Amino acid sequence: LQYGPLAXILGE
């Protein structure tokens, strides 16, 4: 993942 609020969570 490179965008969205989960980006920081997933580290992608």
From Swiss-Prot:
Its cofactor is FAD. The keyword Flavoprotein applies. One of its GO terms (cellular component) is respiratory chain complex I. Keywords: Electron transport, FAD, Flavoprotein, Mitochondrion, Respiratory chain, Transport. Binds 1 FAD per subunit. It is found in: Mitochondrion matrix. Complex I is composed of 45 different subunits. This a component of the hydrophobic protein fraction. Accessory subunit of the mitochondrial membrane respiratory chain NADH dehydrogenase (Complex I), that is believed not to be involved in catalysis. Complex I functions in the transfer of electrons from NADH to the respiratory chain. The immediate electron acceptor for the enzyme is believed to be ubiquinone. Belongs to the complex I NDUFA10 subunit family. This is NADH dehydrogenase [ubiquinone] 1 alpha subcomplex subunit 10.
